[in-house]
Structures are given as structure tokens and as C-alpha cells.
């Protein structure tokens, strides 16, 4: 994957975070910047990814009992009557 790197970002890290990132980079034989970019990509989900995730949660949700339309209408009318 070829991407144009056009923006520079400077961040400050505590010693522990820096140690972990440099250790991962060393183990994988890649620059620290690559590890940081990959972590950002994993942490920032795209809007399409969020929609897909929300849809998956809805599809995976447990079934719930729903009253018949007549009962729902009565419940709605009762709630509206209470609000005035």
C-alpha cells in the first residue's frame, strides 16, 4: 500500500509508552513511525466502520418481546394523554 505522507505530527510520550513502542518496532524491524501509524489506524475507526459495527451489534442483539400493534397504540395514547 502506497500512501502519500504529507503531515508531520509531534507527540510527547512517557518513558513506558516510548519503551513499548520502540520494543515493538525493534521486534518487527520497522520504524517507530510505522508502529504509531498502525496504532492510529486501529484506534480510529472510519465512519463506515462505525456504521458496520453498529449494524453488527443490532443484528447480534438478543430478541425481545414486542406487543401487538394495537397494544403499542394504546400504550402510546396513554403516554400522550399523561403529557397533556
Swiss-Prot record:
Q: What is this protein called?
A: Putative antitoxin VapB7
UniProt keywords, alphabetically: Toxin-antitoxin system
Quick one: which gene encodes this?
vapB7
Q: Provide the function of this protein.
A: Antitoxin component of a possible type II toxin-antitoxin (TA) system. The cognate toxin is VapC7.
Give the CC-aspect GO terms: plasma membrane
